[in-house]
Each structure stands twice: as C-alpha cells, then as structure tokens.
Amino acid sequence: MTNRTSYFYDPDVGNFHYGAGHPMKPHRLSLTHSLVLHYGLYKKMMVFKPYKASQHDMCRFHSEDYIDFLQKVSPNNMQGFTKSLNTFNVGDDCPVFPGLFEFCSRYTGASLQGATQLNHKICDIAINWAGGLHHAKKFEASGFCYVNDIVISILELLKYHPRVLYIDIDIHHGDGVQEAFYLTDRVMTVSFHKYGNYFFPGTGDMYEVGAESGRYYCLNVPLRDGIDDQSYRQLFQPVIKQVVDFYQPTCIVLQCGADSLGCDRLGCFNLSIRGHGECVEFVKSFKIPLLVLGGGGYTVRNVARCWTFETSLLLEESISDELPYSEYFEYFAPDFTLHPDVSTRIENQNSRQYLEQIRQTVFENLKMLNHAPSVQIHDVPSDMLNYERNDEPDPDERGAEENYTRPEAANEFYDGDHDNDKESDVEI
C-alpha cells in the first residue's frame, strides 16, 4: 500500500535572512521547494500551507519569559534588551533579524501540524524541511535555533503514542532534544554526530545515556572526521534496527540535517547525497508513522539537492539525475545534476576498530533497556491544533484538513500517568 504523505511549505519561509555572512540561509528552503515542484513530486503528496505556531504552542516547551522576549525583540529595539539578549543567548550565532518571531512561528507550526496529522492518521509520513532546529533549549537560543520545533512536535505525538523514537543525522549533536527527554522512557533519542576537538555543541559522548526513568533511553554515536557512506551505513543500519526491535516505537521523528554531507560549509563528514538518503530510506522501511524534518546544512545548493532526493525516496518515486530547469537553475552550476561528487580530501578517521568499539558499546547499552515500556492509558488532552478552526480557506492550499475525519476508539489515546484533564501538557 502506498504511503500517504503530507508536505508542509510556507511560501514566505525562505525570505527570512539571518544577516550578512551568517551561514544559516532560510533561502535553501525556496531552492528545495522549487526542485520538488519542477520534478513534479508535489503531485504525489498532500501539500499544505502550514499553521503558524502561537506563543502558547511554543510555551509547551519553552519558558514564557523567553518566548515573550522573542515576540517583542527586533533590530530596531534590541538596544533596550541588552540584559535579555545575554540571558537568552541571542546575539552572534542566533542574531536578532527582521521577522524573527514570525520565522519561528512558521517553521514550528509546520512541524506541529505534521505531528497532529500523524496523530489523526491523516498521513503516514509528514515532511517539513523548514523544521528540525534541534539545539534550542527551554530557556535560550543555541546554534542558529530559537524555538525547538522537534520537542514541541514530540510532546504533541506523546498524546497518542506511548513511545516516540527520535533519530538525528545532522553532523551536530541533537542536544536540545536529548536534554528535553533525558529523564523519560517515553522518548528514545538516537544521535549520530561529530564529537571531539571542541566541535559544537560539545555534547554527545556515548556515555551520555539518560537518567532516572530515561536511563539507557538516550543513545549517542560519536563520530570522527571524514566518515563515508560505507562506514556510516555499517553503524547506522544495525544500530537503528536494534533500537526499533528493542524499543518498538509507535512513531518516529527523523531529523535530516544535511551538514553531514561532504563539502558542507560547516561540516567535516564525507557522506554523499545517496548515502544520506539511504538513512532516510532505511528508517522509512520500518513502516512506522514518520515525521521528517530538516535541520543543519550550509552549502545551500547541496541541501536543496539532498532534501529533494529524500522527498523522492519517501514517495518511492525515481527522479532524473539531470536537474529540471527552474528559476534557481544557476545555483547548481557547473554540473546541473542531482548527485554531484561532494567527496572531499578529508581522511576518514573512523577506523574499523573505532567503529566496532562504538557498536559494541551501543549494543551493550541497548541490552540494559527494558523492552518497550508500557504507558497507562488516559483520555487524550485536547489537540494543539484545533481542527474546528474557522479560518478562511486558503486558495493556495491543495488539501483542507477539515475534510478528514476518522472514528477514534478510546483506547487509542496514550498519556502520562498524571495528566487526564484534557487541558494540560502531556506528562513525560
């Protein structure tokens, strides 16, 4: 049976600008969407102009003071927020730019809407390439990330799903997501990333395994410079298979940061676009409801190629290596192909012995897991997104969610042990 895929894209999200010289370029989202359109992939998906997340949505995870600050600060008034800029780590890596809160609202709303659609079985796979900002913390911005759309989406998924698996293939450790769920067995976090030599964010050692109820439900795979497709595959596939077998997630969130590709402006790995895509294809093969998000990626043309290719893999559609002509065609010079050679001269410092050592340690940690922790069943809290919204229909929107209804059995609703009032946050 073909997967039903929802794809979320806000036509304005690529127009935001972090500032001159900043490596994070939201414009990469416009390039990605253009390729998705010109390859005709949009015909195989339900395409939605996403919901905009509110301050209330963001405060599911973040502190009210921090979100209130993001909503109020602007380049014109930031001189009056000197203390807050320091407190909330907003400045160099995470600058104040025009429309900052609006940008956060758009990418977070799309991820949240994807989670809600998965909960309501409107789709089997939800894609938001604008999301995946995994470094943001409860009280502060970090690593180009302001609002952690991943954590907010997982909290929404936990209303219906007893166990959510989070997988991160960005070159940087998914520290914000790990920190949020470090003490719970409701979410298992698995991150493959560069570790050592003071590489940002400096966390993600394989001995960070979770604590309290979450002990051994946090898995880190620290890698060295220059890892290639073959080495990555030899670790990724057995580790993820073992995790899925042990944990039996009912939903998976996959962060597809493209800075793990070779030739990335801030990266030091040697993955090809096909190698990166293999990870996405492998996760999809488990046929578990899947939320697919973007993340890092700083060589814009290759980010667009990568996420377009991965969209095609999720749709099981073959697309040509020859790029279709589009308004951004010149970005892909000189070869104008989907799969250019992105290998670098960086030596693969991940020896067989090192990879085997990691694999053994990871598998030892997995043996400590309880198989598939169970969760007490409660009434489900109300949805973050109200399906009864009376917004005017958007003429640009291909599908309207109001058209989808599904009978729901009471025993489909999972929640934490202390939360059954239909109003408050999911207890983790």
Curated annotation (Swiss-Prot):
Region Disordered, annotated ranges:
385-428
Q: Where along this sequence does the record place binding of Zn(2+)?
A: D170, H172, D259
Q: Which CDD domains match?
A: HDAC3
Q: What keywords is this UniProt entry annotated with?
A: Biological rhythms, Chromatin regulator, Chromosome, Cytoplasm, Hydrolase, Metal-binding, Nucleus, Repressor, Transcription, Transcription regulation, Zinc
Reactions this protein catalyses: N(6)-acetyl-L-lysyl-[histone] + H2O = L-lysyl-[histone] + acetate
User: What EC identifiers does the entry list?
Assistant: 3.5.1.98
Region annotated Histone deacetylase, chain positions: 3-316
Q: How is its activity regulated?
A: Inositol tetraphosphate (1D-myo-inositol 1,4,5,6-tetrakisphosphate) promotes the histone deacetylase activity by acting as an intermolecular glue between hdac3 and N-Cor repressor complex components.
- Looking at the UniProt record for this protein, which Gene Ontology cellular component terms does it annotate, in alphabetical order? chromosome; cytoplasm; cytosol; nucleus
Domain of life of the organism in this record?
Eukaryota
**Any idea where this protein resides?**
Nucleus; Chromosome; Cytoplasm, Cytosol
Could you say which protein family the record assigns here?
Answer: Belongs to the histone deacetylase family. HD type 1 subfamily.
* PANTHER family associated with the record: HISTONE DEACETYLASE 3, HISTONE DEACETYLASE HDAC1-RELATED
Q: What is the role of the protein in this entry?
A: Responsible for the deacetylation of lysine residues on the N-terminal part of the core histones (H2A, H2B, H3 and H4). Histone deacetylation gives a tag for epigenetic repression and plays an important role in transcriptional regulation, cell cycle progression and developmental events. Histone deacetylases act via the formation of large multiprotein complexes, such as N-Cor repressor complex, which activate the histone deacetylase activity. May play a role in the regulation of the circadian clock in a deacetylase activity-independent manner.
What is the recorded name of this protein? Histone deacetylase 3
Organism for this UniProt entry: Tetraodon nigroviridis (Spotted green pufferfish)
Q: Encoded by which gene? A: hdac3
